[in-house]
Amino acid sequence: MLRLPLKNGTVENYKLVGTPLTPQTPSISFNRIAFAAAHVVASPLFEVDPWQLSGALDWNETLKYRRYLWDQGLNVAEAMDTAQRGMGLDWETAKELIERTVNEARHHPLKPRVVCGAGTDQFGIEDFKNEDQIINAYSEQMETIEKIGGQCVILASRAMMIVSRGPESFLRVYNRLIEQAEKPVILHWLGAMFDPALRGYWGTESISEAVSYTHLTLPTR
């Protein structure tokens, strides 16, 4: 039963009708690998200072939602900037989220894949003065993810926009990260439409040039 507000300021009871859809595992194999950037479920029972950027999550409901996605044959992209990190989930909470999700996936009958966002958000943007500091920050998160058992998704970093000297800076940083990774990585970048501070990422505002840099120059694993 839902209680819906009306235009006249009153509330009306509304009863849902019909048969809810039941999640079903696909009967045939996907010809693509599909990852769901799953959201988290906030707990209304914990008092949290939003200015401290620490999340209060309902872990039971958060993991239940992931099982719901896995039951339908989807994989999960965890701790992503688009789903959680860009909305304020700090690295410490993201790290716990990654660990819980990876462990939960191990016990799921479909053995779903979990890829996890690695960024530089354990530090403030003002802390970065050079490319090596960015590499070290990325490496710290990547090593944590790999130790837990996840596969890394390299998230775009605002810090690169501060210290970058052009395309060569991006190629140097990303080459290092890809070469040292234990498994193939996924590059994740949505550009200015997601975050205006990322305008000109890869050292250019041209999509075709950015694609040529990443496709032709970065190593493949």
Regions found by a protein language model. Give the residues of each.
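N-terminal amphipathic alpha-helix/helix-capping segment at the start of soluble metabolic enzymes
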Residues: 1-38, 62
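Hydrophobic transmembrane signal anchors and adjacent membrane-proximal interface regions, especially
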Residues: 4-6, 160, 215
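Conserved small/polar residues in nucleotide/adenosyl-binding loops
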Residues: 214-220
